[in-house]
């Protein structure tokens, strides 16, 4: 009897850059390739072809993408480029004429076809190689859930609509089906992402679909309520975290879901600035006073709600008075987590044509001031948590010290992965593992992180 020797499966390497939405794109591409029989390589040497999923939002991000392409070309030589910078194929090919293919953002089929051309699959589809929740590039216990693509806004500093197009919402039943599979596969935390989560379903007129015998609208509030009713294998509700939430009036409706425990008390809202004149030049909504009133009302309903936001300093025309207005607004708003960015011109953005550019040294000085302001606010808010007992999801468990003690790193409900703070735990049990959710007594705090012990 002879044994048929099957040809080895071609292997694909992946370099994923940019935002969580791009990471989801990478996961979908790899899931399809795995189903087509491809193996995954953790390094350049073992890959038959390397995919580089690029970011093209800022010039600095473009340069990082070009450097990543250059490294992949030097280390492997067989490279396919995809992602947001794929829109600038001429720039990529001018610098790297030997790349095998260049495709744009979320062009999954074109990427897969390019891989097939570069390293043909040796066998037919192997759907059984794909986990129930698809391939993931995040730890098993948390997953990004992308609900739409593109954006209908025309912010002066942004080129996302040019890179990713207008808003295209996924069907509500498709989103819920994916979420259900992720939770069944071990996900304990769902991070809902898009370019504009609040606008979910607008483009499809909130098209209702049947889900487990009920009609559910494609609307952020309806989606949040349904996600909050999912259950893990232990019978617990997963943490559900909303990102990129524009403060439209209907956002008020999700706050009671937080009070009911259906939604993690956390909102990521891209305010960008507070000065009405700067917001007008940015082509952003200028209702900062109303926002302060709403923040107070949200906190009255869900006292533990954490608000994260990001701000741009040094936007063209920003005066010292504008910047001081922002600092005063932040003092009153008392946001929990804040990211700040120095304005950077982006090729194709409307802001490039605005007069009165802010000098780089002024941008830097304002950046340092806003970071100092928000760090002080964060330190005070975290100090107020000392003595409380909070639920914490474990991200990593360390090795035992010489005395046998083990430490761990986790996050509270106020902390999203990668962008917010941590909770550092001492003297944890050897049985503790990533993905466990435990009650932690907070013993100490600094301006970013909490420190505690499992109760």
Curated annotation (Swiss-Prot):
One Gene Ontology molecular-function label: metal ion binding
Cofactor section: [4Fe-4S] cluster
Cofactor annotation comment: Binds 2 [4Fe-4S] clusters. One cluster is coordinated with 3 cysteines and an exchangeable S-adenosyl-L-methionine.
Keywords: 4Fe-4S, Cytoplasm, Iron, Iron-sulfur, Metal-binding, S-adenosyl-L-methionine, Transferase
Positions of [4Fe-4S] cluster 1 binding: 19, 55, 84
EC number: 2.8.4.4
InterPro entries, per the entry: Elp3/MiaA/NifB-like_rSAM, Methylthiotransferase, Methylthiotransferase_CS, Methylthiotransferase_N, Methylthiotransferase_N_sf, NA-bd_OB-fold, Ribosomal_uS12_MeSTrfase_RimO, rSAM
Reactions catalysed: L-aspartate(89)-[ribosomal protein uS12]-hydrogen + (sulfur carrier)-SH + AH2 + 2 S-adenosyl-L-methionine = 3-methylsulfanyl-L-aspartate(89)-[ribosomal protein uS12]-hydrogen + (sulfur carrier)-H + 5'-deoxyadenosine + L-methionine + A + S-adenosyl-L-homocysteine + 2 H(+)
Record-annotated Radical SAM core domain positions: 137-380
GO CC terms, sorted: cytosol
Primary site of residence: cytoplasm
Family that this chain belongs to: Belongs to the methylthiotransferase family. RimO subfamily.
Name the record gives this protein: Ribosomal protein uS12 methylthiotransferase RimO
Species for this entry: Sphingopyxis alaskensis (strain DSM 13593 / LMG 18877 / RB2256) (Sphingomonas alaskensis)
């Amino acid at each position: 009897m002879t044994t048929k020797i099957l040809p080895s499966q071609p292997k694909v390497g992946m370099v994923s850059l940019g935002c969580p939405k791009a990471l989801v794109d990478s996961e979908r591409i790899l899931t399809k390739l795995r189903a087509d029989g491809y193996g995954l390589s953790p390094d350049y040497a073992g890959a038959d072809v390397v995919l580089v999923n690029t970011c093209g939002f800022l010039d600095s991000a473009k340069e990082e993408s070009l450097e990543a392409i250059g490294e992949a070309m030097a280390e492997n030589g067989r490279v396919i480029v995809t992602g947001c910078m794929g829109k600038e194929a001429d720039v990529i090919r001018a610098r790297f004429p030997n790349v095998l293919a260049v495709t744009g953002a979320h062009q999954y089929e074109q990427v897969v076809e390019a891989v097939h051309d570069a390293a043909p699959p040796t066998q037919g589809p192997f759907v059984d190689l794909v986990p129930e929740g698809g391939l993931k590039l995040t730890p098993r216990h948390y997953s990004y859930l992308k609900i739409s693509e593109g954006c209908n806004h025309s912010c002066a500093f942004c080129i996302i609509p040019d890179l990713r197009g207008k808003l295209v919402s996924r069907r509500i039943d498709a989103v819920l089906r994916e979420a259900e599979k992720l939770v069944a596969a071990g996900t304990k935390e769902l991070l809902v992402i898009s370019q504009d989560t609040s606008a979910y379903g607008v483009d499809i007129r909130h098209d209702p679909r049947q889900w487990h015998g009920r009609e559910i609208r494609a609307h952020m509030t309806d989606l949040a309520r349904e996600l909050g009713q999912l259950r893990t294998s232990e019978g617990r509700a997963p943490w559900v975290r909303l990102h990129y939430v524009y403060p439209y009036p209907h956002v008020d409706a999700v706050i009671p879901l937080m009070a009911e425990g259906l939604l993690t008390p956390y909102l990521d809202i891209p305010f960008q600035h507070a000065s009405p004149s700067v917001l007008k030049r940015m082509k952003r909504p200028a209702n900062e006073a109303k926002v302060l009133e709403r923040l107070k009302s949200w906190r009255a309903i869900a006292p533990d709600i954490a608000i994260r936001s990001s701000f741009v300093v040094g936007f063209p025309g920003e005066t010292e008075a504008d910047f001081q207005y922002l600092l005063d607004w932040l003092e009153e708003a008392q946001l929990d987590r804040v990211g700040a960015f120095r304005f950077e011109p982006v090729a194709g953005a409307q802001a490039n044509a605005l007069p009165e550019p802010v000098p780089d040294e002024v941008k830097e000085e304002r950046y340092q001031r806003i970071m100092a302001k928000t760090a002080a606010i964060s330190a005070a808010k975290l100090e107020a948590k000392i003595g409380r007992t909070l639920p914490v999801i474990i991200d990593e468990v360390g090795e035992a010290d010489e005395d046998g003690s083990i430490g761990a790193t986790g996050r509270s409900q106020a902390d999203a992965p990668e962008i917010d703070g941590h909770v550092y735990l001492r003297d944890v049990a050897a049985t503790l593992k990533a993905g466990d959710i435990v009650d932690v007594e907070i013993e100490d705090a600094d301006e970013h992180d909490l420190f505690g012990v499992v109760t």
